Regions:
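Sec-dependent bacterial lipoprotein signal peptides
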Residues: 1-4
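Active-site histidine-acidic residue metal-binding/catalytic motifs
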Residues: 46-141
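Active-site-proximal helix/loop segments of hydrolytic enzymes
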Residues: 7, 100-267
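A generic signature of intrinsically disordered, low-complexity regions enriched in glycine/proline
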Residues: 16-18, 38, 65, 94, ...
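N-terminal low-complexity, Pro/Thr-rich disordered segments
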Residues: 6-57
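Intrinsic disorder/low-complexity detector
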Residues: 13-16, 36, 70-73, 92, ...
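A generic alpha-helix propensity feature with a strong bias for hydrophobic helices
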Residues: 16, 28, 36, 49, ...
Length: 267
């Protein structure tokens, strides 16, 4: 199987897209606070402190997909890159040295994030509804969030150097789909996420700015709302891999994302 590194080096802004999928989207999955209405009706009404994201819609994009490797024609199809050009629909993603795939990390962390967001009062929409499909493509992963209040795209990096470690967060500059105000909000959200992850004892990757601003990631380029892409760690680094594979690590990442969203979006 050909594996493509999810991320790129800090000095390689024109490398392949990290966020990804397929030319044949499997649709989006929506989930929100209505699913728990029966249970909550028997207890006290949530306060603003209990549900700081009440009334907001958060789009979550678990990068790649488990079926991408089985459909190279789909994931290699050219799609708009959001900057006037085209690029491949997606890549397969990376994996740890013991074979834990990035797409599974992204999916499992998305599940933890969905739960944490709903506990904070948000409605959650997902760019894919399983981890065994193909797609959607990177342009659709950004565009599906048009009716949301923010987009978080989940990834993990695949630098070949096993000594590379730590997370980095990416925002995009203003462009075809996001004006200057939205781009500024994206960078603000990215900065808040850096701080929140550090508060959860995650170490930033010293090779990258905190946050990174890049114009070559099509998922971010197609977002019309504040959007960030998280590379949560280096999957080929043994310590990072152990953390990313653990439910504790995934839940702490989810908690940090919620904290960042609350800081920036708390209505």
């Amino acid at each position: 199987m050909l594996l493509t590194s999810c991320g790129t080096g800090p000095n390689d802004p024109d490398a392949s897209e990290t966020a990804g999928a397929s030319a044949a989207p499997s649709g989006t999955a929506a989930s929100g606070p209505d699913s728990s209405a029966t249970a909550s009706a028997t207890g006290p009404s949530p306060t603003a402190e209990d549900a700081p994201l009440d009334g907001l819609v958060i789009a979550v994009d678990p990068g790649h997909n488990g079926g991408n490797s089985g459909d190279p024609a789909a994931i290699n199809a050219e799609v708009p890159d959001g900057r006037g050009g085209t690029k491949a629909c997606n890549t397969v993603g990376t994996q740890t040295d013991d074979g834990y795939p990035e797409h599974r990390f992204n999916w499992e962390t998305a599940q933890a994030l969905q739960e944490a967001l709903e506990e904070a009062g948000a409605e959650v929409v997902l760019s894919r509804n399983s981890d065994d499909g193909v797609g959607p493509c990177v342009d659709e992963r950004g565009g599906f969030a048009d009716d949301a209040d923010a987009l978080v795209s989940l990834h993990a990096n695949g630098t070949e150097d096993r000594s590379a470690h730590g997370f980095h967060v990416v925002a995009a500059p203003a462009g075809e789909h996001a004006d200057e105000e939205t781009a500024e909000a994206s960078e603000q959200l990215a900065s808040a996420l850096v701080d929140a992850l550090e508060d959860e004892d995650f170490a930033p990757n010293p090779a990258y700015d905190s946050p990174v601003v890049r114009s070559d990631l099509s998922t971010l380029n197609h977002a019309s709302v504040p959007a960030v892409l998280l590379e949560a760690g280096e999957m080929r680094n043994a310590d990072d891999a152990a953390l990313l594979e653990s439910s504790d690590g995934q839940e702490r990442i989810a908690d940090a994302i919620v904290d960042a969203l609350v800081e920036v979006l708390d209505p």
